[in-house]
Regions:
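Domain-level signature for soluble enzymes in the chorismate/prephenate branch of the shikimate pathway
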Residues: 1-267
C-alpha cells in the first residue's frame, strides 16, 4: 500500500515461484518478492527465479521484519515442531535456541504456508508475521522473536514492462545477472569498466550455475539508469568481458519511487 496506494488488490501467494508465475501469466500486474535480509543476506530462491524470468524489476522497498511464534491454542503444550521459511528461522535462531531448543525445526515454502500447517495440527508451531496469525486463526505465543532489533528485508517489485526513468535517473538503480569466463582474473576484468566510468556497485552476490562445475552467476546492483550515456557505455564494455549478461531493469530506488495509477490492479 505504501508503494502502490489503497487501490491495489492483494493476491497472497504460497511461494516465491508462485509470485513469478502469477505476474508472468498476467494474473497479477505486479509482484513483490524478497531479495535480501539485513541479517541472513541474499534470498537464493528469488535470485534463481530472476535468472529465468522474462519479468523486469520496476521498483524496490524495504521494511522492518518482526517475527512471532504462534500456535492454534496460544500455548506450547504438546508442540513438537516449528515451521517457517528458512530465512525466518535463521533470523530467529538465537531466540529459538534459548527458549524452545527441543522443538524440531522444519522449513516451509513461505511463512504463510508455515502458519497454514500450524493451523491444521495442534502439535505444530509457526514463525510468521501477525497478519498470518490473523488469516489462519493462530494465537501468538511470543512476539518479536527476531534476533536483531534492526532486522529489515529488501523487496523487489516485478512487472512485465520495464520502468520509466525517474526524474533523477542518476539516483536510480540497475540490476544485472552475469557470468564470466572460467579463468583467473575474469571477474576483476569484467567489472573494471564500472570503475573506469565512475559507476558505483551497490551489491555483488554469487549463485552456483548448477551445471555440475564450479561456475557461478553473479547478481549486482549498480547506481544509475541505463538511459544515461555513462551507464550505457560502461555496460557495452562490461558485456565484452561477460560470458552471459541479463539486465533485470533500471528502476527508482525506494526513496525515489513514485506510485503510478494502480487503481484496481492486482498485486
Amino acid at each position: 500500500i505504501r508503494q502502490f496506494g489503497s487501490g491495489v488488490v492483494g493476491m497472497p501467494s504460497g511461494s516465491i515461484e508462485e509470485v513469478f508465475r502469477k505476474v508472468e501469466s498476467g494474473d497479477a500486474a505486479y509482484g513483490i518478492v524478497p531479495i535480501e535480509n539485513s541479517t541472513e543476506g541474499a534470498v537464493n530462491r528469488t535470485m534463481d527465479c530472476l535468472l529465468k524470468t522474462p519479468l523486469f524489476i520496476v521498483g524496490e522497498c524495504s521494511i522492518p521484519i518482526q517475527h512471532n511464534l504462534m500456535t492454534r491454542s496460544g500455548s506450547m503444550e504438546g508442540v513438537t515442531r516449528v515451521y517457517s521459511h528458512p530465512q525466518s528461522l535463521g533470523q530467529c535462531v538465537q531466540w529459538l535456541n534459548r527458549n524452545v531448543p527441543s522443538l524440531e525445526r522444519l522449513t516451509a515454502e513461505s511463512n504463510g504456508e508455515a502458519a497454514r500447517l500450524a493451523s491444521e495440527n495442534p502439535t505444530y508451531a509457526a514463525v510468521a508475521g501477525e497478519v498470518a496469525a490473523k488469516i489462519f486463526g493462530l494465537q501468538i505465543v511470543a512476539a518479536n522473536i527476531q534476533d536483531s532489533s534492526t532486522n529489515r528485508t529488501r523487496f523487489l517489485i516485478l512487472g512485465r514492462e520495464p520502468a520509466e526513468p525517474s526524474a533523477n535517473p542518476r539516483e536510480d538503480k540497475t540490476s544485472l545477472i552475469f557470468s564470466v569466463p572460467h579463468r583467473a582474473g575474469s571477474l576483476y576484468q569484467a567489472l573494471k569498466p564500472f570503475d573506469d566510468f565512475g559507476v558505483s556497485m551497490m551489491r555483488l552476490d554469487s549463485r552456483p550455475a548448477k551445471r555440475g562445475t564450479w561456475e557461478y552467476f553473479f547478481y549486482t546492483d549498480i547506481e544509475g539508469n541505463m538511459s544515461e550515456p555513462k551507464i550505457r557505455e560502461a555496460l557495452e564494455i562490461f558485456r565484452e568481458g561477460c560470458a552471459s549478461l541479463k539486465c533485470l531493469g533500471s528502476y527508482p530506488t525506494e526513496k525515489n519511487f513514485r506510485r503510478s495509477d494502480t487503481k484496481g490492479s492486482n498485486l
